[in-house]
Regions:
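Conserved acetyl-CoA binding element of GNAT-fold acetyltransferases
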Residues: 77-93
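Short amphipathic alpha-helix that is part of the acyltransferase structural core
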Residues: 1-37
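Conserved acetyl-CoA-binding loop-helix of GNAT-fold acetyltransferases
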Residues: 90, 95-112
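C-terminal "cap" of GNAT-fold acetyltransferases
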Residues: 146-174
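Conserved beta-strand-loop-alpha-helix junction that forms the acyl-donor binding cleft
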Residues: 107, 120-134
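Alpha-helical elements of Rossmann-like donor-binding domains used by nucleotide-donor carbohydrate transfer enzymes
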Residues: 16-20, 48, 102, 106
């Protein structure tokens, strides 16, 4: 059960994120090799802000990394107005829309209060072949296009930051 989230840039927490990313890399793509996961981490970890979500036993049950960007390629820009969520990982035994939405709500509220410049847009991608994630993202974001990813077609979703915050804060906590 989801308890709380921690926002961090410490090496210890980055290591926890990396371990979870490597362990569950096949949830992004069944073809993602260990080498590709390591390359992803080496290329993106430095620019990423990390969110770890914990259960009541202080075990990591979910992780997210994001950065600010200002272009359609989602390259890092510290002054960008778009928050690009690069990855979200939820432990398989904890996977549910409720866990995702509660952690996502806490993350967006934290970002609203602590990230400057405040983003005006949130963007993320999902494998075209993953119906569960695409259905989940369509609940709160608009499909804005496709791009060729490392392992096939990815659907890009975008949403106004304040609209997303409003949507997530209407959800009840349990």
């Amino acid at each position: 059960m989801y308890s709380h989230s921690v926002f961090t840039t410490s090496d210890t927490e980055r290591a926890k994120f990396s371990a979870m990313f490597i362990t569950y890399r096949e949830h992004f793509s069944k073809q993602m090799s260990l080498e590709e996961a390591l390359i992803y981490l080496l290329t993106n970890l430095e620019q990423s802000s990390i969110v770890l979500s914990f259960n009541e036993h202080q075990q990591v049950i979910a992780a997210m990394n994001y950065w600010l960007t200002s272009d359609d390629e989602f390259t890092y820009d510290a002054n960008g107005g778009c928050l690009y969520i690069s990855s979200v990982i939820i432990h398989p035994e904890q996977r549910s829309s409720r866990v995702f939405m509660q952690g996502f709500r806490d993350s967006i509220n934290y970002i609203d209060q602590h990230v400057f410049p405040k983003p005006h847009t949130v963007a993320f991608a999902a494998q075209d072949s993953n119906p569960y994630v695409n259905k989940l993202y369509r609940k709160f974001a608009t499909f804005s296009g496709q791009r060729e990813g490392f392992h096939g077609l990815e659907n890009i979703y975008m949403v106004n930051f304040n609209d997303l915050k409003y949507f997530l804060n209407r959800l009840k906590s349990k």
